Amino acid sequence: MGRVFMVDLEGNIYICKLCKTHLSTDQDIMSKSFQCKNGRAYLFNNVVNVSVGEKEDRMMITGLHNVVDIFCVGCGSNVGWKYEFAHEKSQKYKEGKSVLELYKISGPHDSNDLVSDGDDA
């Protein structure tokens, strides 16, 4: 296997809670109102330093989606999922976007975002 090159981000960054690998920035947040099994999650336009799992259809609150789990390249931890295909027309905006689960990441949200309640997505 080849060498893994990691991207270092600048600004207000979100990192893997386990190994501190950079994952995204606050500028890439599209929505703070997502839910996962273990609490809140954010939808990001761009996520770096992740690998993807197998594609699968998954039934979510907003309908059926084709997704891949995403894993931190630093430690292999599952940090969320990426939308590959949305079956519902109203959900097409999610295609190609990634969701990071807040309990698996650290970042700017740790200071004040966790105080507010998000809507289910």
From Swiss-Prot:
One Gene Ontology MF term? metal ion binding
Q: Which UniProt keywords apply?
A: Metal-binding, Zinc
Looking up InterPro entries in the UniProt record yields: Yippee, Yippee/Mis18/Cereblon, Yippee_fam
Q: Which residues form a coiled coil?
A: none
- Chain sites annotated for binding Zn(2+): C16, C19, C72, C75
What would be one Pfam family of this protein? Yippee-Mis18
Q: Which residues form the Yippee domain?
A: 12-109
Family membership, please give it. Answer: Belongs to the yippee family.
**Stated name of the protein:** Protein yippee-like At3g55890
Q: State the organism named in the record.
A: Arabidopsis thaliana
